């Protein structure tokens, strides 16, 4: 079973988590579901190298915002790691275990529903941040690129629906 993770102060991740949690049962801090569980954490997801010590799951899916200086609208996903200096969480020169199957399935699902997201680029982003120390597969699923998209509950709900499908 997978654990979906959203950072409380990440508007896109938190919006996706709120939507997904509606059909789940709250058990302490964990929303329990049939196919995956969900937590909302109080610290940035890029620094969540600790998550595996506290939660035992087959893999980790981080729901998050995507930011880009270009301003290009994007729905993206990527595995985590740092090929050089760790400027955004994780450890220097460490790459986490990729969640290749989920990445492939999510991208195929996005492509199948591309008309619903016609103004967005659908991309695999380069690996560039933490967490990096996880030994189970992990992936970030992101909505970009500005606060307008991150706070668009309709968009976040649509992406969350696709996450639920995969």
Question: What residue ranges belong to the model's regions?
Answer:
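N-terminal catalytic or cofactor-binding beta/alpha core of small enzyme domains
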Residues: 1-129, 133, 146-147, 153-157, ...
